[in-house]
Amino acid sequence: MVPNTTKQVLNSLILDFLVKHQFQDTAKAFSKESPNLPSIPPLMDCSQGFLLEWWQVFFDLFQVRYGDGNSNNNPNNKLYHDYLRVQETQKHLFSQLPLIQQQQQQQHHFQQQQQQQGQQGQPFSQQQQRGIGVASGMQNQQHQFAPQHQGQPQGPGQTPQPPGSATNANFPINMPPNSNPQQQMFPINQQFAQMPNGQNQPSMEQQQRMAMMMKQQAMAAQRQQIPMNGLDPQQQQQMMNAVGGGPGNLNLQQQLFLQQQQQQQQQPKTTFQQQAQNQMNNLRQQAAMVAQQQQQQQQQQQQQGQLQGNLASAMGDSSSKNNSPVGARSNQQSTPQQNAAPAPSPHPSQQGQAQAQHNFQSQQQQQQQQMTKMAGSQGMKKNGQMSNGTSNNSSGRNNNALRDYQNQLMLLERQNKERLEFARNTGNSDSNPLSNGMMFAGQNQYSNSNQNQNQLPPNQQQPTPATFHPPPPPTTANGPQGQFNQKPSPATSNNSPALGNKSSPAMGNKKSKKESNSKKGKKANSNASTTANNKTSGQTTPNMSQPPSAGTEPKQPQPTEQMRQLQDKQQRPGSNTPSMGKKDFQPLTPRSEPISGETTKKKRKSGKLNDNNENSNGNSPKKQAKTNANSKNLDPIIKEEENGVLSLKKESSTSLQDQDLDLNPPLAPTQATAMSNTFNDDPFDVHLLDTQHHHQQNSNNSNHNRGQNLSNGSNNLSVSGPGMGMNNSVFGDSTHAFDINFNIDSLDDIWTTTGPGGDITGTGSGSGGAGGTDDDNFMGMNWAADPIENGD
């Protein structure tokens, strides 16, 4: 419910409105219905009535808030809103004036110092001490006092601070004259002062933080630099005095602005529209000023960003140079390189790189100098209460950090230069890789192996392209990887000089053919019988890898896989067997075996062998002519082999010469000659003079497709083929290759050797007469290991 007094006042105002607007009848009726109305208060007494005045104000506000669409176009409303906006901007400008003025003072102070230093010729290091105010220039002005300083008691020597409503709490208006500037610095500077061991070197992260703070503060200053209007001259004068400056410290634009404000306030007050127009003009002028300052600050920030990017790239280049393979190589170089020959002059491209690096360093130093000058122009401040000693001390701490950082950069660049030069010199001096310890593949580079290599004779240290000299055998200290022995050079035996330098006739260019399962089975059986017979007779099968003195010297281990691969590379084209040199092949004839009194070979009787002399030596001149004709088509090595057999035959015993025994074996059918086409690849068994066993083993073989004529006799089979004449009782069927099995047990009482000294009958004791030996009977046979072992 509305109280009676308020209702009565409203009735009085209604009656007053009716009377003043000449509604007489209505006023009389209203007074009769509500008598005894109080009088109108003097403040509400208006010429047109208080009720009308109130209604006009209410209606204007109502239209602004809930009016029609055309109400926003009202110029009066626009002026009112502009007025409110100007009032807000003035408050911000009032809070930012100290910062702007201090920046101008710092710039002026720094210019004076530069002029003095230029006259005195001070070095660049002292300019840095006064010019590095980047960190402390901006932060000291904005973070000097926290909000709690406002409630602290103040001493008699300090000027009182205005309340928080008059200014922003984060930005001070008055500074205590006796306050220490170091206590008002940014916390980062306090951290530098509190670092142990006097290390006032800011890290990269701290420098980046300081740069970010500077950028943020510059942007805030740009947004808050708005003209100051609506303040009384006394308030403006108080504000300027509180800052510690006067009109002389302001720039030309600010002085003009203050003069305009004073003129406007001294003039009589005009209408509200004129004031708003003046304020808009002032806003335009101030916006132009702000845009100009903002452009300058953006240029400065871009320069700072470029300098920081150059510093970061310089750090990255130095770190990458330290981590590069060239730097690592230079660190690992040994000191004996100092005694090496002088390095040749660097390549022109290397000189260009060094020149580019030098140019980059000089450019970096110039950029650092520009950064220090620009930082000093922005951050160096001129404070009335701050003495020159304290300013030098505060800037000296920051300068020490930057100077140490620059020294470290220069030291790193110098070290990288030296390492690059050293790496180039050492890289050019290492022209011969073999002289630096490089050896053949597969060998470990140990110290003892290098010593052995240095102790080799000259003919082995520098192998010629024509011959291959394997590396020397390392000692056992090299481990199992380096343990291998060279294959002993097979010197020719004194017993067989003619065959020592010849290769086997079976080492041909013809590739081996695959055998059927039946053939392989026969070969396996024949090999098994050979080993069994050797065990019973005490005879050891000759081996390719054995040297001529295999009975007296210990066995040496085989070479490693690498030596075998090198030997495989020396094969003749089109052959599956390695092409061994003249000294690498040693025919395993009975003459090449060592003669010792402890041999267990049994002597054979030659009774039936003498009966077959006519068959063995009965080759007609036609067959000999065919043999000579076929020998023309043979390889030169095979011709030499045949000549060797003939020369060996001449050195045989006198008993064989008297009997004209020709035990020369035919050439291997696997040889790529004209004779090899007359034989089949099937293996055959040879049983010397054992016709019964021979007929049992070869009864199942019926291959007669080669055009060979077989005649079965009592003790032998004569084979007639193109260029062939052999004793079949010795070599078996002609349809088989040389897969020979010797049944020695059946020949114990058959062999008989006759010599000048008498008739010797072999009884298995291994001893003979003076005229003949057991080895002479096998003199004409070439017991090569490859045709026997390979079979085909």
Curated annotation (Swiss-Prot):
Domain of life: Eukaryota
Biological function: Transcription factor which mediates CO(2) sensing. Required for CO(2)-induced white-to-opaque switching, as well as for filamentous growth and virulence. Required for both normoxic and hypoxic biofilm formation. Hypoxic biofilm formation is a major cause of perseverance and antifungal resistance during infections.
Region (Disordered): 100-184, 286-400, 424-676, 692-724, 755-777
Gene Ontology molecular function, alphabetical: DNA binding; DNA-binding transcription activator activity
Subunit structure: Interacts with EFG1 and MSS11.
Organism from which the protein derives: Candida albicans (strain SC5314 / ATCC MYA-2876)
Protein's name in the database: Transcriptional regulator of filamentous growth FLO8
UniProt biased composition (Low complexity): 100-129, 139-158, 286-308, 330-370, 383-400, 443-467, 524-537, 610-619, 697-721
